[in-house]
Design a protein with these regions (language model features):
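Short beta-strand "wing" residues that participate in macromolecule-binding interfaces
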Residues: 71
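Glycine-centered, phosphate/nucleic-acid-interacting loop/turn motifs that mediate DNA/RNA or nucleotide
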Residues: 67
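Amphipathic alpha-helical dimerization/coiled-coil segments
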Residues: 1-14, 31-36, 83-99
Length: 99
C-alpha cells in the first residue's frame, strides 16, 4: 500500500491499518520503530520486542501489507522503517471521519 505523501487513505486502507494496529505485538513493533528515525534490522526488532523469528516475520508482513512499514533490503538483510506519512494520513482520516 505505498501511497504518496499527502494522499487521502481509502476506507479500506484505514480499516487495514486499524486491524494491524489492533494486535498487541504489532502495536509494540510500531512503537519501537517510531522511537527511531532510522531503520531497524529484523534482529533489532526481535531483540527489543522478544518476539520469536517466525511470529515476527508474520507481523512484519502484516504491517507491510497495511502500509505501515517499508522494507529496506541490503543484500540478504532486511531492515524496517516506519511509514510516518501513512500513519499521519491514518490519523488525519480518523480526525475527519470522527469530527
Amino acid at each position: 500500500m505505498s501511497e504518496p505523501a499527502g494522499k487521502t487513505l481509502t476506507e479500506d486502507q484505514v480499516l487495514l491499518i486499524a486491524k494491524a494496529l489492533g494486535e498487541r505485538r504489532r502495536y509494540e513493533i510500531v512503537k519501537r520503530l517510531g522511537e527511531r528515525p532510522d531503520a531497524l534490522t529484523c534482529c533489532a526488532v526481535r531483540d527489543c520486542t522478544g518476539i520469536n523469528p517466525a511470529t515476527l516475520s508474520h507481523h512484519m508482513k502484516e504491517l507491510e501489507i497495511a502500509g505501515l512499514v517499508e522494507v529496506v533490503r541490503e543484500g540478504k538483510f532486511a531492515s524496517y522503517v516506519l511509514r510516518r506519512d501513512v500513519l499521519e494520513a491514518f490519523f488525519q482520516r480518523l480526525r475527519e471521519d470522527l469530527a
